[in-house]
Structures are given as C-alpha cells and as structure tokens.
C-alpha cells in the first residue's frame, strides 16, 4: 500500500489543499493542518479502494479530498483498532479510533455520501515519530500487541 494523496486545510471548514509532501511532528500532527496541535486527532487516513466502493454505491465518483481526510492510500483496508500502527518512512502513526463520516459530506459530495462512507471513512491517528510523508511512500501496517 502506498500514499496516493495528501490533503491539509488551514482551518475548520476551509478548503482542503492537495500537497505532494507534509511534515508530521510527533505529538502534534501535520504542519499546516487545522488539527496540528490537537490532543489526539493528528492525522486522518483512508483507502482509495474503499472510497471507490462508496462511489459505486452512491452512483457517482468524487475526489478523495472531498472526504476531508489527510492521507489517502491507494489500496487495502485501513486498520481501525486502537493501538494499530502504521509506518510511513520515518513517521509512525497509532490508530486512536475510527473516523466517522460527517453529515456535512452530504452537502459537499451529495446526498447519501455519509451513509456510503460508513465503515469506509478510515481512521484517526496520533503521530508517534516525526518525519516527512510524501505521495508514493510505502505504508506498513502493524496490528496492536496481543492481536
């Protein structure tokens, strides 16, 4: 699995901006993103494969940035169990919780988007180690200890 897209926004409800790379800071999140400095919601991550399934269910395609997630990987399932780890280059992320789709997605993508994205909206992670994340980077997934 590889990073297919990176999106950040300067503030809540402001447009998401696609970038080729971003700096992740341990304990604080992605530089330049609205959640930088938040306690646990440092990074959100989703799978394009699951977005494609949601688009098929909706009957129309949409850009991965429309979901307002930070990272989109090209394929596979995103771990949702708290404690699961993802490693992208030097950056280590820990899953905190499932990223629930917001009802506002129905406004941005279209009616039924939030329902189509249920169980496909990815995960919320905290940043454990700092480094750069680039489009094309490999993503390694590790299950939580004891699983």
Question: Each PLM stretch: what is its role?
Answer:
Residues 1-147:
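Metal-cofactor-dependent catalytic cores
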């Amino acid at each position: 699995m590889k990073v297919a897209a990176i999106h950040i926004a300067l503030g809540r409800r402001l447009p998401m901006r696609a970038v080729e790379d971003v700096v992740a800071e341990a304990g604080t999140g992605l530089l330049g993103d609205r959640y930088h400095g938040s306690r646990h919601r440092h990074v959100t991550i989703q799978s394009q494969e699951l977005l494609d399934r949601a688009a098929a269910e909706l009957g129309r395609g949409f850009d991965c940035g429309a979901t307002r997630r930070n990272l989109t990987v090209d394929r596979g399932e995103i771990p949702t169990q708290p404690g699961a780890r993802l490693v992208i280059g030097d950056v280590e992320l820990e899953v905190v919780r499932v990223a629930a789709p917001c009802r506002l997605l129905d406004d941005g993508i279209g009616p039924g988007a939030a329902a189509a994205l249920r169980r496909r909206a990815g995960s919320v992670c905290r940043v454990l180690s700092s480094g750069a994340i680039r489009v094309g980077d490999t993503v390694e997934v590790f299950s939580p200890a004891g699983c």
